[in-house]
């Protein structure tokens, strides 16, 4: 009886470990994206993972020479915009490391694995033009005023 109980306990333990590993591995199956945002002349690399309606967003702001000026991680609630390939991200302020520098981020999907993210209040047509022309035309010309 003791041996049967021990064998059953061992099998149960193995099952629990396997279940735990599966549960831990499940969040790894997230959609990863990389992109660049340009705000006031500074380039910011963005790396984010989406899972359900929550997003973890890692941002690294660099100067034109590529030196890191600031980097942070925060968690956002993802609000998809069904009319476009856009996600509005609202910071989850229950996270102690939530950055209030970026109240709302809008992420635009420009292609497979390519995203453009802007703080909502800073998003302007001119900045979109700067990004898109640099991205797809290779250069940027100041628009006529």
UniProtKB/Swiss-Prot annotation:
Function: Involved in TCP pilus biogenesis.
Impact when changing residue 23 to L: In strain: Z17561
Disulfide bonds, paired cysteine numbers: none
Name of this protein: Toxin coregulated pilus biosynthesis protein H
Organism ancestry: Bacteria, Pseudomonadati, Pseudomonadota, Gammaproteobacteria, Vibrionales
Species of provenance: Vibrio cholerae serotype O1 (strain ATCC 39315 / El Tor Inaba N16961)
